Swiss-Prot record:
InterPro entries: CcO_II (IPR045187), CcO_II-like_C (IPR002429), CcO_II_C (IPR034210), Copper_CuA (IPR001505), Cupredoxin (IPR008972), Cyt_c_oxidase_su2 (IPR014222), Cyt_c_oxidase_su2_TM_dom (IPR011759), Cyt_c_oxidase_su2_TM_sf (IPR036257). This is Cytochrome c oxidase subunit 2. Belongs to the cytochrome c oxidase subunit 2 family. It is found in: Mitochondrion inner membrane. Cu cation A1 binds at residues 161, 196, 200, 207. It comes from Hybomys univittatus. Cu cation A2 binds at residues 196, 198, 200, 204. One of its GO terms (cellular component) is mitochondrial inner membrane. Residues 46-59 are mitochondrial matrix.
């Protein structure tokens, strides 16, 4: 969940988001060390009075500043490739949900169940109840079982959209005529909010996403009541 004036990432709720948070910290530390080194060298150049006007080349220095950046790039690329593989790979999903973007709402279809589908519209500000969040609440939440791998198939009926839930580490483009895939998995129950993250028209800001992650038994009871 996001908070006012928040500067950091949202709390990780899925294994993928935990990996992304660790990778963010790993990369940020490398960037911080490089920036510190560069600023230190610049300060030395501005303050020292010693110069080497006769130096034409420095083979050792050139070797270092060629090899060192290559090593740094490898240290960044290896964990990045691992996370990319984890985000794309899904074996034996417990559930498949088809998500379609529209101007300006989402529709969901539980493909493992017959006739379990619905549209999800934003609740207008005037209809909100005490404690509900402005521009983030919907009339029909996506109820999913926690601690199970779930495959989301994402596409669009009209223009480009993007289905994003930050606390789960999800952001997948919804493209007309193309079916994209994302993996949803939550470590704990709760409500997780997202929004369309691709400018899709005048009401782009009014396409919220609400995932309600519940234990498997509650999900089975809910799905039985919806059919």
């Amino acid at each position: 969940m996001a908070y006012p004036f928040q500067l950091g990432l949202q709390d990780a709720t899925s294994p993928i988001m935990e990996e992304l948070t660790n990778f963010h910290d790993h990369t940020l530390m490398i960037v911080f060390l490089i920036s510190t080194l560069v600023l230190y060298i610049i300060s030395l150049m501005l303050t020292t009075k010693l110069t080497h006007t006769s130096t034409m080349d420095a083979q050792e220095v050139e070797t270092i500043w060629t090899i060192l950046p290559a090593v740094i790039l490898i240290l960044i690329a290896l964990p990045s490739l691992r996370i990319l593989y984890m985000m794309d790979e899904i074996n034996n999903p417990a559930l498949t949900v088809k998500t379609m973007g529209h101007q300006w709402y989402w529709s969901y279809e539980y493909t493992d169940y017959e006739d379990l589908c619905f549209d999800s519209y934003m609740i207008p500000t005037n209809d909100l109840k005490p404690g509900e969040l402005r521009l983030l609440e919907v009339d029909n939440r996506v109820v999913l079982p926690m601690e199970l791998p779930i495959r989301m198939l994402i596409s669009s009926e009209d223009v480009l959209h993007s289905w994003a839930v930050p606390s789960l580490g999800l952001k997948t483009d919804a493209i007309p005529g193309r079916l994209n895939q994302a993996t949803v998995s939550s470590n704990r129950p709760g409500l997780f909010y997202g929004q369309c993250s691709e400018i899709c028209g005048s009401n782009h800001s009014f396409m919220p996403i609400v995932l309600e992650m519940v234990p498997l038994k509650y999900f089975e009871d809910w799905s039985a009541s919806m059919i």
